[in-house]
A protein has these predicted regions:
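Glycine-rich, basic loop-to-helix element that forms the pyrophosphate-binding segment
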Residues: 36-52
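Alpha-helical elements of Rossmann-like donor-binding domains used by nucleotide-donor carbohydrate transfer enzymes
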Residues: 14-21, 43, 47, 70-77
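Short aromatic/hydrophobic "clamp" motif used to bind/position activated sugar donors
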Residues: 57
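N-proximal low-complexity "stem/linker" segments adjacent to membrane-targeting elements
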Residues: 1-24, 31
């Protein structure tokens, strides 16, 4: 099984419902952590790891949408390969001084889609 965890400034029950529906897995464990900047994201993610009832934890933001329908089973298949311990969808090969990993698009890796006003 997979746990999905995210940090948010305010509770978003509609996002929890979206995650469950889009995953295609009704029993998806979702851990929402309301955090108004009092804790670092790393600390919140560590709390999620401690609370998770599964060995696989997906961290995400509270404003994402999955382009892949029924993504749960597809993601789970990747973890059946024992040579994976961590899987990422997007990032950079080098972190600029600004901390904005998307600043140099030539160093971006993965898939990032943004809505026009998002």
């Amino acid at each position: 099984m997979i746990t999905v965890g995210y940090s948010t400034r305010e509770s978003k029950p509609e996002f929890i419902e979206y995650l469950k529906k889009s995953s295609g897995f009704k029993k998806l464990e979702v851990i929402e952590k309301v955090n108004n900047g009092t804790k670092s994201l790393a600390r919140v993610y560590n709390e999620i790891l401690l609370e998770a009832k599964t060995d696989i934890v997906l961290f995400c933001h509270d404003d994402i949408y999955f382009d892949t329908p029924a993504w749960y089973s597809k993601l789970l298949k990747h973890f059946e390969k024992t040579d994976f311990g961590i899987i990422g969808m997007a990032g950079t090969t080098s972190m600029p001084a600004s901390g904005m990993w998307w600043e140099d698009r030539k160093k971006m890796v993965g898939i990032v889609n943004h809505e026009k006003d998002g």
